[in-house]
UniProtKB/Swiss-Prot annotation:
The lineage of its organism: Bacteria, Pseudomonadati, Pseudomonadota, Betaproteobacteria, Burkholderiales. The keyword Transferase applies. GO terms for biological process: ubiquitin-dependent protein catabolic process via the N-end rule pathway. Disulfide bonds: none annotated. The keyword GTP-binding does not apply. This is Aspartate/glutamate leucyltransferase. It is found in: Cytoplasm. Belongs to the R-transferase family. Bpt subfamily. It comes from Bordetella petrii (strain ATCC BAA-461 / DSM 12804 / CCUG 43448). Its EC number is 2.3.2.29.
Length: 244
């Protein structure tokens, strides 16, 4: 276990996990660098950690720390300068009938049912398609930072999508989103656009989208939200030519 001097947390320590199978690149082994102890990571500390390329899963705050791979790149959208492309504008128009309801984290059988249908429909065999209620709650409903749950419902009140968002000092961090896998249109794209609009409303400059991987189809959508910054070599910067 070691302390990282470049991070401004005298009381936090950072350690590397043992290797485990990579969730995104088949055949690869991954490691994570974990910030601990978790109870010291409040909203302010977490905002600074996100600026250093970290994100969280439940109470687990981490960033990639693989031995021979740097494929996972933290990315964030410049919300003030963002301009949607044609397909994004179409997704935005196509879901204008949805209403968003922002709430505190709370258990809901309706949410869990939608989560289960989403995992089974979009990520079958991915390991999360049989998550128990406890696993779901630990993953999405457990937080020590400033987190919100957003419901999206249609005109009849039917739940179409749920998004979990962390509110940071300089932006929003998109934690996880799940939606009706049978729905038409690009609900995932609409969700990111909605979060960008929320950043603008709150005068927050950045929307953090987690990690982008060039060779992962699951991550490809993130490169479409421009201008995008990448966290490379310890600093946020514009994508080098040919990166995206």
């Amino acid at each position: 276990m070691s302390q990282l001097k470049e991070l401004p947390f005298a009381t936090l320590q950072f350690y590397s996990t043992a290797p485990y199978p990579c969730s995104y690149l088949p055949g690869q082994q991954a490691r994570s660098q974990v910030a601990a102890p978790g109870h010291l990571i409040n909203a302010g500390a977490y905002s600074q950690l996100v600026e250093q390329g970290f994100r969280r899963s439940g109470l687990f705050t981490y960033r990639p720390h693989c031995d021979n791979c740097r494929a996972c790149v933290p990315v964030r959208v410049d919300t003030a300068r963002f301009a949607p492309n044609r397909s994004q504008r179409r997704a935005w128009r196509g879901h204008q009938g949805l209403r968003a309801f922002v709430a505190e984290l709370a258990w809901s059988p309706e949410h869990y049912d939608l989560y289960t249908r989403y995992q089974q429909g979009r990520h079958p065999g991915g390991g999360m398609d049989d998550d128990s209620r406890t696993q779901y709650a630990q993953f999405l409903l457990t937080s020590r930072v400033n987190t919100r749950l957003v419901e999206f419902r249609d005109a009849e009140g039917t739940l179409a999508m749920v998004s979990i968002i962390d509110v940071l000092d300089d932006g929003l961090s998109s934690v996880y989103t799940f939606y009706d896998p049978a729905a038409r249109g690009s609900l995932g794209t609409y969700n990111v656009l909605w979060q960008i609009e929320q950043c603008r409303t709150l005068d927050l400059p950045w929307l953090y989208l987690g990690y982008w991987i060039r060779d992962s189809r699951k991550m490809a959508y993130k490169s479409g939200f421009k201008p995008l910054q990448l966290y490379l070599d310890g600093a946020w910067q514009a994508p080098p030519p040919g990166t995206l």
